Amino acid sequence: MSEEKKTEEEITREGNPRKPQGEEGKVMLDRMNHSHYEVTGWALAHWKIKGDDQILDIGCGGGMTLHRMTEQLTTGHATGVDYSGVSVEETGKLNEAFVKEGKLTVLEASVEKLPFKDDTFDKIITVESFYFWPDPQANLKEVHRVLKKGGTFLLVADVYQNGHLTEQQKKNITRYELFNPTEEEFREIFQIAGFAETVIHTRDGENWICVEGHK
């Protein structure tokens, strides 16, 4: 069966996290909450979340990153968006208490057209989703649009093009058609998107990258 003829649920069963669907998608999202935990914690250490921050998580997946950020808020608010309805559902379940408190909102939406006004958020993050963005350059401009002046955007990934990828990582990049830039390519697309400064963090012994864009 060709990739084009496979349903989203069939692709999910094969392990592609592009858009989790069905019961297999729920299992995948739970696995992501655990497998992304360490790289996310490392990336979040580059931020200082303030109690009154307005935060957006793009591609919120299973909702663990939102949970970790929202518990640091007092008068602030966190919003998660994902174009997978299953992800929105699972994020809401994991963060049910925060949703009821009014500290967290979860929406089904795409990075292609974020349903927010210009200059809405102090901080924006995306964890392990940038590979799948349909038009990375245009989508970065959309992120820049909804970020407040003086705000920061964190792009977090546990693999990037650095010359040290494993054979399995290379196969996955090809198989799932992942967008996987080098450090210099990241700097270039962030600059074109309008970010005033781009800081890149990497971790020795890992293929992790955290691209920090300042507006």
Segments the model singles out, each with a brief description of its role:
Residues 6-33, 152-212:
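C-terminal alpha-helical "lid/dimerization" subdomain adjacent to the S-adenosyl-L-methionine
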Residues 52, 147-153:
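Short glycine-dipeptide loop
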Residues 34-53, 68:
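Conserved alpha-helix/loop element of class I SAM-dependent methyltransferases that forms part
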Residues 137-149:
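A short glycine-rich, Lys/Arg-flanked "PGG" loop and its adjoining helix->strand segment in the class I
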Residues 123-135:
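A short SAM/SAH-binding and catalytic strip from SAM-dependent methyltransferases
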Residues 38, 64, 85-86, 131, ...:
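Short alpha-helical
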Residues 54-113:
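Class I SAM-dependent methyltransferase SAM/SAH-binding core
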Residues 112-123:
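A short acidic, Gly/Pro-enriched loop at the edge of an enzyme's catalytic core
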